Regions:
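Short, surface-exposed beta-strand/strand-loop-strand elements in extracellular ectodomains
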Residues: 317-328
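Viral virion structural and adsorption modules
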Residues: 706-731
C-alpha cells in the first residue's frame, strides 16, 4: 500500500507524480571508511512542472527571468509521511526537463538537516574569528602579567579577565612552561656549567634565594620566552559565536575535552625581540581597488607588488623573504633597516598560467609595532589597474591579541582534527543544535528494534568487510628538539600508533585478504615532548620542573602545527623537593620566586593515577615516569571498538530487504541495534522507499561495546588472533 508522501519547500507544498517514489539513503559512519561521516540524502526524484511547482521554482527553465530561482543554494524542505514529519532538511534543484520547449518536470535531491561545515567555515583560519568572547582574553603582555599567568593563571569573571591569586584548577587562560627560545635547566650549583652546547641561551631556573648569579650570568624564567594557552571550550564558544551554531555534547563536559588547552604561538623566538612576522597575502585587507587574489599571470599579464614594511624603530634591521605557497619557490629576498618599500616583480613563469599565492616572512625584527601595506599593479599592454592592501601584525601596541596569535590552521581542519583524535560523530537535532558524541557513546544511546517479521529472509546477502593491511594513527611531522631526538633514539614516533595486520610478514600479507589498502587517521596537530628536570649537580635527583622547548633539532626557534595539551598547576616547593623556581621579570640577574607554575602535559595523570593521554599509542607521562606506560590512550579509549569490529573474525556485512511500517520507518535511528531472527546487528546503511516502505538494509554484525578500564579490556569472549592484528610501535 502506497503511503501519502508530502514534500514542502519553504513551507509550500510541492506537487508530486502519483507514480514517483522517493528513496532516502541514511548512514552515519561507513565501516569501510572509518573517518567519513555521512548525511541522509534522497536519490534523485522528479516532480511535475505544474502551475504550482513552476511558481515554487520560479520557472527555472527560463534564464531570462530576473530574480529567478537560484539553484546554487539548497532550499529549506520538509518531508512528511502520512501526515507525520519524516525528515527536515534541504532540497537541491538539479535540472528542469523540457519537451517541445515546454517544461515537463524538475529533478530534485533531498538532504537531511545537517551543517555543511566546508561551506560554512570556508577557508577561514582560527585567527579570522573576530569574536567578543576571544577579545575578553586579550592582555597587556608584560613581565607582571606573564608572571601572573605563569603562576596561577587567569579566569573570566563577568566580562573581565582576572589574575587568580590562588591555584585554580582548569583556569581559562594560562601561561605554560613552554619556551620559544631559551634552554632551561636546574643546577643546585649556581656556578655550574650549562648542560647544553649550542647557540641557544641557557638559563638556570634555581631561584638562589633571589641573589644574583656570579659573573652576571642570567637566570630564571625569561617572561619573553612564554606564550599563553587558552582553554579549548572557550575556543569552541568562539566558533559558535562566529558561525551562529550551537554544539550540544556530553563529551564536551568530560575532563578529556574540558581540560584541553591550545597553545597560542604563531611567532618564532622571544616576544618582542628578534621575532619573526609571517603572513600570507590572503590575510591582507583590501583597502581599495579590485581584489586580484589569487594573482594569476599569463604570457600577456603580469603584476608588480610594492610592499611597504612600516616599523616604529628606524634602527631595527631585518630580512624579508617572499615565497609562493603553490610551489614553495622563493620569489624575493632582501635585507633592510627601518621602514622600507620593496619592489617585487610577479612575472609569468611558463605554462598556460602561473598563480602566485604569496607568503611574507620578516625575520629578526625587534619592534612591537609592524604594519604592512601593499600596492598591487596589474600590467597588460601597460598599467591597467591598482589595488591597495594592508596588514597589521599581532604584537602591535604591546597587547597580546588572542585571536591573532592563534596557530595558523583552518577552522575546518581544527574541528576535523578533534573529530579524528576522539573518534567523534555529529548530527543535527530537531532544535538545530549540532550534537557531538564519541562514536561509542552515540551507539550506546541507541535502542533495540526487532524487524524480523518485516524482512524478506529469502533475499539476503552475507559478505565480509574490506580489511586494511595497515592503519596509521599519526600526528604531523614533529619540528621540536625533544620530540625529534626522542624519535631518533627510540626508533619510535612519539604519540603515534600503527595497526600492522601483516606483522611485517610478506607471506602472511599474501595470504590475507587485505583489499582495503592502507589507511591514515591524521589530525593536523603536532606533538611536543616535555622534559622533567633533574639537578645537573646530582642527575639522579628529579625536580618539580617540567617544560617544553619550541626549537628545532639544531636549536633554532621554530613554529609548529597546533599543539593541544593538558596542564597541572605544580607547587614547586613541595616536600621533599623544597626548591624554588626563579622568574626573571627584567631580563637581568635578580629573580623573584615562583610558588606555582603550569607544567604542560600530554596526559591527565596525577602522582598516583594515570589519566587520559593525548597520544594514540602508549607513552609514559613525562613528569610521572614512575607510573610506567600510560595505556589510557586515544586509541584504547576512542578507537579500539571501531577497529576491533572491523577485524573481528565473526564480522559480516549482511544485506536484507524489508518492508518497514511507518511506526518503524519514521522512528528508527542509525544508532539503534536491529534484531533479525534473534541476531543483533548495527546499521551501516538504510535505503528506504518512503512511498512504499520497501527498504534495503546493510547491517554489520553486532559486537558489544567494551569500555577501557585502566589496564584491562573486557572483550566479552572476543579474541583477536595475534597474527592478524598487532600494534607496531616502530613506525
Amino acid at each position: 500500500m502506497r503511503r501519502n508522501v508530502e514534500v514542502f519547500i519553504n513551507n509550500q507544498r510541492v506537487d508530486l507524480f502519483d507514480f514517483e517514489d522517493i528513496n532516502i539513503v541514511d548512514s552515519v559512519q561507513d565501516v569501510r571508511d572509518i573517518a567519513k561521516i555521512f548525511v541522509p540524502y534522497s536519490r534523485e526524484f522528479t516532480v511535475p512542472a505544474s502551475k504550482n511547482n513552476n511558481k515554487i521554482f520560479k520557472h527555472y527553465y527560463n534564464n531570462d527571468i530576473v530574480n529567478g530561482f537560484d539553484a546554487r543554494f539548497k532550499i529549506s524542505a520538509v518531508i512528511k509521511v502520512n501526515g507525520m514529519v519524516y525528515k527536515n532538511g534541504r532540497v537541491t534543484l538539479l535540472n528542469s526537463s523540457l519537451k517541445n520547449n515546454r517544461p515537463v518536470n524538475y529533478k530534485l535531491v533531498f538532504y537531511s538537516k545537517t551543517i555543511d561545515f566546508k561551506t560554512l567555515l570556508s577557508d577561514d583560519l582560527l585567527e579570522d574569528m573576530d569574536t567578543s568572547i576571544l577579545s575578553k582574553f586579550n592582555i597587556e603582555y608584560n613581565a607582571q602579567n606573564v608572571f601572573d599567568g605563569f603562576n596561577y593563571g587567569y579566569s573570566l569573571i563577568g566580562e573581565n579577565i582576572v589574575a587568580n591569586d590562588v591555584p585554580v584548577e582548569n583556569s581559562d587562560l594560562i601561561i605554560p612552561f613552554i619556551s620559544t627560545n631559551s634552554h632551561y635547566y636546574y643546577d643546585d650549583n649556581v656556578a655550574g656549567i650549562s648542560p647544553l652546547e649550542g647557540d641557544s641561551e641557557s638559563r638556570n631556573v634555581n631561584f638562589n634565594g633571589g641573589v644574583a648569579y656570579p659573573n652576571n650570568v642570567v637566570s630564571g624564567v625569561n617572561w619573553k620566552d612564554l606564550r599563553p594557552s587558552l582553554k579549548l571550550p572557550i575556543l569552541m564558544q568562539a566558533i559558535e559565536e562566529k558561525y551562529g551554531i550551537s554544539f550540544v555534547s556530553d563529551f564536551f563536559t568530560t575532563d578529556a575535552f574540558n581540560k584541553l588547552y591550545i597553545w597560542l604561538n604563531n611567532d618564532k623566538g622571544l616576544y618582542g625581540e628578534e621575532r619573526t612576522v609571517g603572513t600570507d597575502f590572503s590575510e591582507f585587507t583590501l583597502d581599495n581597488g579590485n581584489d586580484e587574489r589569487p594573482i594569476t599571470t599569463t604570457s600577456s599579464v603580469f603584476y608588480r607588488l610594492l610592499l611597504t614594511v612600516n616599523i616604529d624603530d628606524v634602527n631595527d634591521d631585518y630580512e624579508l623573504n617572499v615565497t609562493n605557497n603553490n610551489d614553495s619557490k622563493t620569489i624575493y629576498t632582501s635585507t633592510a633597516k627601518g621602514t622600507n618599500t620593496f619592489e617585487i616583480p610577479l612575472l609569468f613563469r611558463g605554462g598556460g598560467i602561473y598563480i602566485y599565492d604569496l607568503n611574507f616572512e620578516i625575520t629578526g625584527v625587534e619592534s612591537n609595532s609592524i604594519t604592512l601595506s601593499a600596492k598591487l599593479e596589474l600590467f597588460s599592454n601597460g598599467l591597467q589597474s591598482t589595488s591597495n592592501y594592508s596588514f597589521v601584525d599581532a604584537a602591535t601596541d604591546g597587547v597580546f591579541n588572542i585571536r591573532k596569535n592563534m596557530p595558523k590552521v583552518k577552522v575546518i581542519d581544527f574541528l576535523t582534527g578533534l573529530f579524528k583524535m576522539f573518534n567523534l560523530t555529529a548530527y543535527v537535532n530537531d532544535d538545530d543544535n549540532i550534537v557531538v558524541d564519541t562514536l561509542d557513546d552515540y551507539y550506546r544511546k541507541g535502542s533495540t528494534v526487532d524487524i524480523t517479521r518485516f524482512t524478506k529472509n529469502e533475499e539476503s546477502t552475507v559478505s565480509r568487510n574490506k580489511l586494511y593491511s595497515q592503519i596509521d594513527f599519526m600526528f604531523e611531522e614533529p619540528k621540536t628538539f625533544a620530540t625529534i631526538n626522542s624519535n631518533e633514539l627510540s626508533r619510535d614516533e612519539f604519540g603515534n600508533e600503527r595497526i600492522d595486520n601483516t606483522n611485517n610478514d610478506p607471506e602472511l600479507s599474501a595470504l590475507l585478504a587485505f583489499d582495503g589498502g592502507k589507511y591514515e587517521v591524521a589530525p593536523k596537530f603536532e606533538k611536543m615532548q616535555y622534559e622533567r628536570m633533574t639537578d645537573q649537580s646530582n642527575p639522579t635527583l628529579l625536580q618539580n620542573f617540567c617544560w617544553g622547548w619550541c626549537v628545532t633539532d639544531d636549536q633554532k626557534a621554530t613554529l609548529t602545527k597546533p599543539i593541544l595539551h593538558y596542564t597541572e598547576n605544580v607547587d614547586v616547593d613541595v616536600i621533599p623537593l623544597t626548591v624554588q623556581m626563579g622568574f626573571d621579570p627584567t631580563t637581568g640577574q635578580a629573580n623573584i620566586p615562583v610558588s606555582y607554575y603550569f607544567r604542560p602535559s600530554n596526559s591527565l595523570s596525577t602522582s598516583t593515577t594515570l589519566g587520559q593521554s593525548l597520544h594514540f599509542g602508549s607513552e609514559e607521562d613525562e613528569f610521572y615516569t614512575s607510573l610506567g606506560s600510560n595505556e589510557t590512550s586515544l586509541f584504547n579509549m576512542y578507537w579500539k571498538n571501531t577497529i576491533l569490529a572491523i577485524y573481528d573474525e565473526k564480522s559480516r556485512i549482511t544485506t536484507y530487504k524489508a518492508n518497514l511500517p511507518i511506526s518503524i520507518a519514521n522512528t528508527i535511528k542509525l544508532n539503534d541495534v536491529v534484531v533479525v531472527n534473534r541476531k543483533k546487528y548495527r546499521i551501516n546503511k538504510i535505503d528506504i522507499n518512503i512511498t512504499t516502505g520497501d527498504a534495503n538494509l546493510e547491517l554489520v554484525t553486532y559486537r558489544k561495546l567494551v569500555r577501557y578500564n585502566g589496564f584491562t579490556v573486557d572483550n566479552d569472549g572476543f579474541t583477536v588472533d595475534s597474527t592478524l592484528i598487532t600494534v607496531d610501535k616502530t613506525i
